Amino acid sequence: MAPQSLPSSRMAPLGMLLGLLMAACFTFCLSHQNLKEFALTNPEKSSTKETERKETKAEEELDAEVLEVFHPTHEWQALQPGQAVPAGSHVRLNLQTGEREAKLQYEDKFRNNLKGKRLDINTNTYTSQDLKSALAKFKEGAEMESSKEDKARQAEVKRLFRPIEELKKDFDELNVVIETDMQIMVRLINKFNSSSSSLEEKIAALFDLEYYVHQMDNAQDLLSFGGLQVVINGLNSTEPLVKEYAAFVLGAAFSSNPKVQVEAIEGGALQKLLVILATEQPLTAKKKVLFALCSLLRHFPYAQRQFLKLGGLQVLRTLVQEKGTEVLAVRVVTLLYDLVTEKMFAEEEAELTQEMSPEKLQQYRQVHLLPGLWEQGWCEITAHLLALPEHDAREKVLQTLGVLLTTCRDRYRQDPQLGRTLASLQAEYQVLASLELQDGEDEGYFQELLGSVNSLLKELR
């Protein structure tokens, strides 16, 4: 049986359907091929974009983490993941919780000024050359500032003080003269030596002159223009005040000034001083004269020898035996102690060091002071002065008794009053020394006095 053919009205739709299917299949194949070609020809570009996208995301996450800063306190606090810990913080791992914890260190208690903030240190901001330039400018600025301050200070000094030349010029215009010490002393000597000056003016001139001659150079200048002899001659005045203040000036000029001492001996000062001490004069005048005598004799063996020749020990003996002269007696005893020890030390120094000149050593050896003291009865005089009530006076007398012990030992032993006085002082100073020990003074004043008394008693047994 022959096959049946389809009518033409059905064939047309089938052909259209088949054509659409073929067109769709072709389009799909073409698009798939283009996609593969695109993927194969641009792999690097696609990978770079993906990497940049991931890095950007990581940086954003990192910035977010950095901005979350941990603020430590003095108590332990748990650290969250990603938190920034300020430098200097103390970090530990809590073994119980497994968390990291942080707090401030103890030494940061008073110097945590950053409050946990990060310092933005950008090393690319300044180069080393920039820093050097900035430092140079800073130094220049400091120097300029210092220079400005110096100029301002100098201007202030110039405003307050004027040059000496300008002052002299102004003084010349005002008839005012700036005097040197030498000129002042010449004027004072002329005032004192003028017959037209009153007693008050003469005393005022001597009083002012004493201030200047304390300086060694001024005292020698006084000698150079003849002023020293004028003052020495003032010791002959009939006015006790003139004698007193003239001796006051001489005592200041003689003190530790060998050149002036020599000229004073040659000018007759020693004889005049002894005459005043040997005659009836006010106590104040004799104090000043005795001061001048002590200044003249100390460290001047030639003057000491002349003092002995002129009967100085007799004059002093008479002085201390007068009533109401206890103050002078203590000063005389102190002078004798100084002269005796001075000679002893000078001879010892000459033997040990051999630095003293033979001439001066010979002068000291010619001063026979200890034999003179023994002959003039100073052993007994000094011992009787131990009865003075003042502790300071007793101290000086005890010192003098000690240096005279070798010369006066026999006379001390034969003096019953001295033994009783020493025993009384021993009992008195034992009580006072024990009080010092109770107050915690191991080397007190009264303990030293007690030691001197005990030493004398031991030597005289």
From Swiss-Prot:
Gene Ontology terms: biological process: cotranslational protein targeting to membrane; intracellular protein transport; protein folding
Q: Where in the cell is it found?
A: Endoplasmic reticulum lumen
Cite a single Pfam family from the UniProt record: Fes1
Indicate whether Signal appears among the record's keywords: yes
Q: Is the keyword Signal assigned to this protein?
A: yes
Q: Where is this region: Interaction with HSPA5 and localization to the endoplasmic reticulum?
A: 1-256
What are this entry's molecular-function GO terms? Answer: adenyl-nucleotide exchange factor activity; identical protein binding; unfolded protein binding
The alphabetical list of record keywords is: Disease variant, Endoplasmic reticulum, Glycoprotein, Protein transport, Signal, Translocation, Transport, Ubl conjugation
Glycosylated residues, chain numbering? 193, 236
What Gene3D superfamilies does the annotation carry? Leucine-rich Repeat Variant
Q: What do the Gene Ontology cellular component annotations say?
A: endoplasmic reticulum; endoplasmic reticulum lumen; extracellular space
Question: Where's it mainly located?
Answer: endoplasmic reticulum
Q: In which tissues is it expressed?
A: Highly expressed in tissues which produce large amounts of secreted proteins such as kidney, liver and placenta. Also expressed in colon, heart, lung, ovary, pancreas, peripheral leukocyte, prostate, spleen and thymus. Expressed at low levels throughout the brain.
Instruction: Consult the record and explain the modifications the protein receives after translation.
Output: N-glycosylated. Ubiquitinated by the CRL2(FEM1A) and CRL2(FEM1C) complexes, which recognize the -Lys-Xaa-Xaa-Arg C-degron at the C-terminus, leading to its degradation.
Q: Which residues form the signal peptide?
A: 1-31
Q: Which domain of life is it from?
A: Eukaryota
Q: Which disease is it linked to?
A: Marinesco-Sjoegren syndrome: Autosomal recessive multisystem disorder which is characterized by cerebellar ataxia due to cerebellar atrophy, with Purkinje and granule cell loss and myopathy featuring marked muscle replacement with fat and connective tissue. Other cardinal features include bilateral cataracts, hypergonadotrophic hypogonadism and mild to severe intellectual disability. Skeletal abnormalities, short stature, dysarthria, strabismus and nystagmus are also frequent findings.
Quote the PANTHER family the UniProt record gives: NUCLEOTIDE EXCHANGE FACTOR SIL1, PROTEIN FOLDING REGULATOR
- Describe the family membership recorded for this protein in Swiss-Prot or TrEMBL: Belongs to the SIL1 family.
What role does this protein play? Required for protein translocation and folding in the endoplasmic reticulum (ER). Functions as a nucleotide exchange factor for the ER lumenal chaperone HSPA5.
UniProt subunit comment: Interacts with HSPA5.
Q: What is this protein called?
A: Nucleotide exchange factor SIL1
Q: Which organism is it from?
A: Homo sapiens (Human)
What gene is it encoded by?
Answer: SIL1
